[in-house]
C-alpha cells in the first residue's frame, strides 16, 4: 500500500513559509528544523538562498515560500520585504527593545517618522517587481503604501 493510500503526504506538494535575512540563511533554527521536518537538506537551501540574495543588503528580512515535492526535491520563491519594514526603514523609525524598528502604538495620534512621496513611489516600484503584484497599476500600489504608512504612524509629505 502506498503512502497516499495510507493517508500520508505521498503525492502532495507541501509549502513552507519562512522569513530569512538576505545572505544570512544557515541550517540553524528557524531554517534547519522547518526544512528538515519535510526531508530537505537545509544546507542545499541555504547555499542557493544566499546566492540569490547576495545583491540585497545583508540582513533584510525576505519572505520565502519553499515548495517541497513528494520526491523531496524543492524550489523556492523569494518575495520582496514587507511593506511595513520598508516604510519603517525609510522613515528611520526608532529601534525598539527587540532591536527592530517599531511603528506607533496609537497610529492616529502618535507619529514615529515621515516619508516623502518619492519614498512611497520607490517602495511601490519594489513591490511591483514581485510577480503576483506585477499586474497592478503603480498608482494603486502607491495608495496601498500610503495607507500602510498611516496605519503604522508614519506621515507622508508631498
Curated annotation (Swiss-Prot):
Function: Component of the mitochondrial ribosome (mitoribosome), a dedicated translation machinery responsible for the synthesis of mitochondrial genome-encoded proteins, including at least some of the essential transmembrane subunits of the mitochondrial respiratory chain. The mitoribosomes are attached to the mitochondrial inner membrane and translation products are cotranslationally integrated into the membrane.
Keyword line: Mitochondrion, Ribonucleoprotein, Ribosomal protein
Record-linked SUPFAM superfamilies: Ribosomal L11/L12e N-terminal domain, Ribosomal protein L11, C-terminal domain
Pfam families to which the protein is assigned, alphabetical: Ribosomal_L11 (PF00298), Ribosomal_L11_N (PF03946)
Gene Ontology CC terms: mitochondrial large ribosomal subunit
Family according to the record: Belongs to the universal ribosomal protein uL11 family.
UniProt entry tagged with the keyword Ribonucleoprotein: yes
PANTHER family: 60S RIBOSOMAL PROTEIN L12, LARGE RIBOSOMAL SUBUNIT PROTEIN UL11M
Organism encoding this protein: Neurospora crassa (strain ATCC 24698 / 74-OR23-1A / CBS 708.71 / DSM 1257 / FGSC 987)
Gene Ontology biological process: translation
GO MF, one example: structural constituent of ribosome
Protein name: Large ribosomal subunit protein uL11m
Quaternary organization: Component of the mitochondrial large ribosomal subunit (mt-LSU). Mature N.crassa 74S mitochondrial ribosomes consist of a small (37S) and a large (54S) subunit. The 37S small subunit contains a 16S ribosomal RNA (16S mt-rRNA) and 32 different proteins. The 54S large subunit contains a 23S rRNA (23S mt-rRNA) and 42 different proteins.
Localization terms from the record: Mitochondrion
Amino acid at each position: 500500500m502506498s503512502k497516499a493510500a495510507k493517508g500520508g503526504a505521498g503525492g502532495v506538494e507541501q509549502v513552507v513559509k519562512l522569513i530569512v535575512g538576505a545572505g544570512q540563511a544557515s541550517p540553524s533554527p528557524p531554517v534547519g528544523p522547518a526544512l528538515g521536518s519535510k526531508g530537505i537538506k537545509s544546507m542545499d537551501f541555504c547555499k542557493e538562498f544566499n546566492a540569490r540574495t547576495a545583491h540585497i543588503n545583508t540582513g533584510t528580512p525576505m519572505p520565502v515560500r519553499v515548495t517541497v515535492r513528494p520526491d523531496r526535491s524543492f524550489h523556492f520563491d523569494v518575495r520582496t520585504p514587507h511593506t511595513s519594514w520598508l516604510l519603517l526603514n525609510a522613515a528611520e523609525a526608532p529601534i525598539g527593545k527587540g532591536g527592530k524598528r517599531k511603528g506607533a502604538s496609537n497610529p492616529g495620534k502618535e507619529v514615529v517618522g515621515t516619508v516623502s512621496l518619492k519614498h512611497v513611489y520607490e517602495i511601490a516600484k519594489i513591490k511591483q517587481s514581485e510577480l503576483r503584484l506585477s499586474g497592478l497599476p503603480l498608482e494603486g500600489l502607491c495608495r496601498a503604501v500610503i495607507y500602510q504608512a498611516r496605519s503604522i504612524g508614519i506621515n507622508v509629505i508631498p
